[in-house]
Amino acid sequence: HQGYIEPQSATALWSEDDSKLKIWCSNQGHFSVRNEVSALLDIPVSTIKVIPMEIGGGFGGKITAHIEPVAAILSKKSGRPVKISLDRSEVLQCTGPTSGGIVKAKIGATNEGKFIAATCNVYLDAGAYPGSFIENACNTAYAPYDIPNLQLKGYDVVTNKPKTGAYRAPGTPNSALAVETAVDEISKKLKIDPVHLRLKNAADKGTRKADGTIYPEIGMVATANSVLEHQHYSESLPEPSNKSFKVGRGIAFGYSGNINGAATVIGNVVEDGTITLITGAVDIGGTRISIAQQFAEVLGIDPTLINPTVADTDSIGYTSASVGSSASHKNGWAAYQCALDIKDQLEERVSKIWDVPKDTVIFKDGRAISKTDSKLIMSFKELSSLLDETGGPITGRGNVDARGCAGSFSANIVDLEIDIETGKVNILRYTAFQDAGKAIHPSYV
C-alpha cells in the first residue's frame, strides 16, 4: 500500500440555491475528481466546482475519487455540507493497494554476454475489477537494454480482492525484479562482471523499445559508467558482524518514464513588482516552487517574486492530475509559455512608454533595455508600478498538451548481511545512482 500518513478527506456542499455542487478534497487531480463525479452522478461538469486542498502524501494512491461522490449524495439528501474522512483501517480497505503478480523472464545471450532475445510474461493482480498497470510492467521490463528480439505478454488478472491502484511507477518493480534476477544469473553463468554485462547491453540513443518507440538521448550508459567509477563498486565487502552472518553485494538497474497531459498556467503582473501565478496543478513534491522557478527564469527575476497558487476547477483551464512524474514537466512548460507571453507584453508596453519600435526593446535579466540606446533601462519593478497609467494590467497564459516520454534510468548497489540461522537482514551500505535529468530544484531531488 502507498502508506501515506494523511488519509483521504473530502467535504461536499450541494446547494439548492444555484444547483452547484462544491467539493473540497485532498486529491492528486481535482479535475479528475470533477469528471469522475460527473460521470458517476450523471450531472454536467459545469455544475461541479472542485477546490483542491493540501494533500500531504499521495504516491499514486489519491488519484481516484473514492469518497467525494458519497459526500456529494449525502449533502444533497441532507441539504447540509457533509465531510467524510477515512480512518487508517478504511484507507487500507478501500483505496487500492498496488498489484501483486507473477513475472516470468527469459533471456538468451551469446557466450560473450550479448543479449540476442528475451521474453517476459507478466501476470498482475487487478483485484475485483480489470485495470492493473500491465502496460507499465511490460513496457519497462527490458527498457534498460538493447535486445533485438523481444516478446512480452501481459495478463490483467481479476481476483476476489480489493481493486488495486497506482503506487509509484506501478507494475515497474514487478517486472524489473524478474529481469534483473535473470541478468544476474547470466552474469554468474558466463562469469562476466554484472555491471560490465549491463553496459555491454545498455540501451542508448536510437535503441528501439518493446513498444516500438525509439530512444532519443538517454542516460543508461552514463548511469552504468558512474557505477564503475564509484568507490562503492570497487571496494571490498565489509566483514560480517558475527559468525552467523553472511555478507553479499547486489547490483540492479531500473527504468521509469514520466507520463504527460494537459496543463494551464495564468500569470498576473502585480503593481509592486511581483507576479501571481495561477496553476491547475495540485502540489505534490514541490510543484509550485518548481513551476515558479521555470517561470522566473524566462524573465530573469528572483523566484521569490512569484506567488504560485492552485486554482479550483472553475478558475483555471483543464489540467491533468499530478501523477506519473509529470507535474514539473507539463506545468513547467505551461509556465514557460505563460512567461514568454508576459515578456512579449512587457516589451510592447515599454516600447510605448519610450515611444520606440517594439523590435528595439528586449526584456531580460529582470529589466527592459533598448537595443539602440544604452541609457534607456527600466526595471521590472518600475515597469510594474506604471501599468495602470500606461495601458492597464498585463496577464499571460500558457496552455500545453504535453506528449512524449523522457525515460529515466537508475542503478543501485547494496551491501547487506543475513543471519543464516534466523533470516534477519541488515543493510550495511546502499548507493543509488539516478539519471535525474535537469534538477529544477536540486534540494528536492
What would you call each of these model-derived segments?
Residues 1-222, 229, 239-445:
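Cofactor-binding beta-sheet edge motifs in enzyme active sites
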Residues 226, 230-234:
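Short, basic alpha-helical nucleic acid-contact segments in DNA-binding proteins
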